[in-house]
UniProtKB/Swiss-Prot annotation:
Subunit structure: Component of the heterotrimeric velvet complex composed of LAE1, VEL1 and VEL2; VEL1A acting as a bridging protein between LAE1 and VEL2. Forms a heterodimeric complex with VOS1; the formation of the VEL2-VOS1 complex is light-dependent.
Residue span(s) of domain Velvet: 32-341
The protein's name: Velvet complex subunit 2
Protein family: Belongs to the velvet family. VelB subfamily.
Main localization category: nucleus
This protein's GO CC annotations: cytoplasm; nucleus
Organism of this sequence: Cochliobolus heterostrophus (strain C5 / ATCC 48332 / race O) (Southern corn leaf blight fungus)
Role description: Component of the velvet transcription factor complex that controls sexual/asexual developmental ratio in response to light, promoting sexual development in the darkness while stimulating asexual sporulation under illumination. The velvet complex acts as a global regulator for secondary metabolite gene expression. Component of the VEL2-VOS1 heterodimeric complex that plays a dual role in activating genes associated with spore maturation and repressing certain development-associated genes.
InterPro entries recorded: Velvet, Velvet_dom, Velvet_dom_sf
Keywords: Cytoplasm, Nucleus, Sporulation, Transcription, Transcription regulation
GO biological process terms on file: sporulation resulting in formation of a cellular spore
Entry's localization field: Nucleus; Cytoplasm
Disruption phenotype: Produces only albino pseudothecia. reduces tolerance to oxidative and thermal stresses. Leads to increased expression of VOS1.
Amino acid sequence: MAASMAHYQGHLSNRITTGRAETVGQAQYPPRRAERKYKLEVEQQPIRARMCGFGDKDRRPITPPPCIRLVVLDEMDRELDFNEIDSTYFVLMVDLWNESGQSAVNLVRHSSAAPTVSISSSTTTSYPPPPERSHYVATTIPGYDAHSQAYRHQQHQHQHQHQHMQPQPMAAAGYGPGAHTGVAVPPYYPPTPQPPTPTYQQYPAPAPAAPYGQAPAPSAMIPATPMSSNHTRNLIGMNAVNACRLNDTKNKPGFWFVLQDLSVRTEGTFRLKLFLFDIGAGDGTNATVAADGPTRGKGKCLAVNFSDPFTVYSAKKFPGVIESTPLSKCFAQQGIKIPIRKDGPKLPNQAEYDADD
């Protein structure tokens, strides 16, 4: 009994002096997130692309498609086996940066001269508001009831255009052929009670008429048009991708991020900035994710890296897409949607046809 007690005390003293008083056998479990290191290795760098312009459906993918391998290291800087990693909630985010990697160039000013017209502004332009007519008559004919005339104008707005050209009853009564030589005052019309608003009146109601002798306010004559932003995204396509479990050209399995659907609107030299996020909740293995899926809060950025500079050409200067690489063909055979150039004799402008595929 005494011998076994001494053996236990010696074993306990050894664990305390070596600093390993935690759970025995912890090394057999995956290390915690704080003890892991994550790296993004760009195994296939982007080289060139043709600018896609500002069309909504025009896409000119970057060639070759960037392929990024996820590397996870333990506390001893040893690469972990992919079987020990759950990449379910690992997400790669991509931004577009300048050649020097000093500033982001995700937004670009739209170069089109035609402004984008919203629905409200186009409706106002297609159907001129009644205040223009009422203000014009109110400032030229004294004693005229602008409110009643504006209502009559709205009431007959759906009739034929030749009915609008007929003289109004007031003009026929008070302004005959020789009326312009005198200072005759038109007869007084009693105010007409306002009926309920017609159901077809879906446009802004007429503004109140300005008093006689005063010019109407500019805001009453010309409806304000909201200013729309003329900036748009410079990098378009899938800029957030999940990790895929793929085998490389040496048949080595691993986790890869393939960016086969990225296009740039403008020409120039750029870099891709890559961010690795873990949107799961747990110890880095994503084994204790909540039942409702990924976290609703903030996701931790685990790694950041840049690609090599690549050039985006205009349509006239574009030398053609890059030949399909062995890595692209390898991933395409495993189900990744990468456009692969067909082998065989090349026809004139074959590069353009392949780029449109």
